[in-house]
Amino acid sequence: MSYRYNGCSLLLLLCVLLPVTTNAGELVVSQGYVRATPPGVSSSAAYLTLLNETGKRRVLVAVTSDRAKQVMMHQNQWQGDMMQMRHVSQLEIAPGAHFDFEPGGYHLMLTGLAQPLVAGERVLLKFAFQRGDTYEVSLPVLDVGAAMDMKGQH
């Protein structure tokens, strides 16, 4: 009887603690996708909207992926008549606000891909925040045409 009681207690404890340790609160990802890559190309980009419903300011400091050696936050900016991409070390998302990673603006650059990303696959992204909390999301890989169609639905 004590083994059954201890097992139930452990299960209840895990159910209570698991949500606290695996996500950053009420962060919502929408319109997310990663661009498919042709053979021989070792980088791609991810686009999504990240909504902060936590009631607290969140500062995104890093992103990692199961498919890329490195994920960098970038911002495209016009410098005169040339578009330039610059690295961003952190992004602040106010309570109740959303942040858009989208073509032509901020985006997530996935580099060091060992294999091409094929439409229909999924890519796991793990967001790390300044307070040490994390949030994981699995995004679909879309070909360029499907990704453009999805952007039109935003």
What do the PLM-derived regions correspond to, one by one?
Residues S9-P19:
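Bacterial N-terminal signal peptides
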Residues V20-A24:
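Sec/Tat signal peptide C-region and signal peptidase I cleavage site
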Residues M1-L10:
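Bacterial N-terminal signal peptides that target proteins for export
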Residues G25-H154:
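Compact, glycine-rich, soluble single-domain proteins
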